[in-house]
Amino acid sequence: MSRSETLFANAQKHIPGGVNSPVRAFKSVGGTPLFFKHAEGAYVTDEDDKRYVDYVGSWGPMILGHSHPDVLDAVRNQLQHGLSYGAPTAMETEMADLVCSLVPSLEMVRMVSSGTEATMSAIRLARGFTGRDSIIKFEGCYHGHSDSLLVKAGSGALTQGVPSSAGVPAAFAKHTLTLPFNDIDAVEKMLAEVGQDVACIIVEPVAGNMNCVPPAPGFLEGLRSLCDKHGVVLIFDEVMTGFRVALGGAQAYYGVTPDLTTFGKIIGGGMPVGCFGGKRLIMERIAPLGPVYQAGTLSGNPLAMAAGLTTLRLISRPGFHAELTDYTTRLLDGLQQRADAAGIPFVTTQAGGMFGLYFSGADDIVTFEDVMASDAALFGRFFHLMLEGGVYLAPSAFEAGFTSIAHGEAELKLTLDAAERAFAKLK
């Protein structure tokens, strides 16, 4: 019995399902989840001392790779001064100034402790600003686990085969209108019917919780135009794409400006953190300036600010994102070539340093239906074969993968060699 198997059995005694986030349980791919004890650079090491090239990256934040020395030094330095104050710090202002300088649509920001808090707060703010109740989201897009957003959600909800969560009252969900991702005609029709009741449209500009589905040409631009027409607040959930697909996020990458944006993951450098921000006119509606209440004991935590500031400064160097994107492109090209050579139906998608892998005969992946039509069982087999080869992919056919600047030629070769062997065994 492996150490991970023993730990998983023990964990299930007092932790529901043995994990603290459902997708970690390997339900989608089968088998026992790996328990990790160390991470450095492009690698993670499990409790049985096996090392893997990591394409999960703690599900997105580790864009520099694990245990970057500058980030660790920043956290160690802050540790000498305390863990949390429950009061303002200079670093919070530094972070706000830096984030607003990197993302031009931001005029003001508020720090929180998670991506879920960020999206929940942004939606409350949009409702308070507009005086309207309804929101529009898209099938397969996951915006955290607040009640009103667990309607046809992505991420773990897809791997469990359920569209939403038990425990969410119908009254909470009735104001959540769900439309097909990448279908601008459906949005136009809905707003023509009920636009006067819609406070906001929230969207992952790249849907990263039903694997990785980039926006169709004109989709984000269409959302911007329709929101302007109907007085609806446009919210980009950039918890995943922020500072990853480009330094200015997906809004810079695709050239579309939202009214509000939510962030997480990279902005904390690996520490628990979230952030939302946008137009001053809207943000000034938040307490203590306005009537929309939002608060948090650990918001702006100094350890998270230290890690996040250091990370954002490091990724701001010229050429950083071009290098990250180039590695990701070469990785996907290599995987596609090896799948084609083995006669395996396989499609990849990419947005900067995030990617999707699909066992599908489709020409492209554009819709929720395209994602659901892919072969999740075959992905599960591929996942375990890649593990045997020393490569750790996301343990779900419905989660995006992530590269880091620590991934280099050695990791690329190891990954592609493992994939070549894996595809051969899938024939």
UniProtKB/Swiss-Prot annotation:
Assigned EC number: 5.4.3.8
Location relative to the cell: Cytoplasm
Pathway the protein acts in: Porphyrin-containing compound metabolism; protoporphyrin-IX biosynthesis; 5-aminolevulinate from L-glutamyl-tRNA(Glu): step 2/2
GO cellular component, one term: cytoplasm
Catalytic activity: (S)-4-amino-5-oxopentanoate = 5-aminolevulinate
Keywords tagged on the record: Cytoplasm, Isomerase, Porphyrin biosynthesis, Pyridoxal phosphate
GO molecular function: glutamate-1-semialdehyde 2,1-aminomutase activity; pyridoxal phosphate binding; transaminase activity
PROSITE patterns in UniProt: AA_TRANSFER_CLASS_3
EC class name: isomerase
Entry-annotated residues carrying N6-(pyridoxal phosphate)lysine: K265
Known partners and oligomeric status: Homodimer.
Protein name: Glutamate-1-semialdehyde 2,1-aminomutase
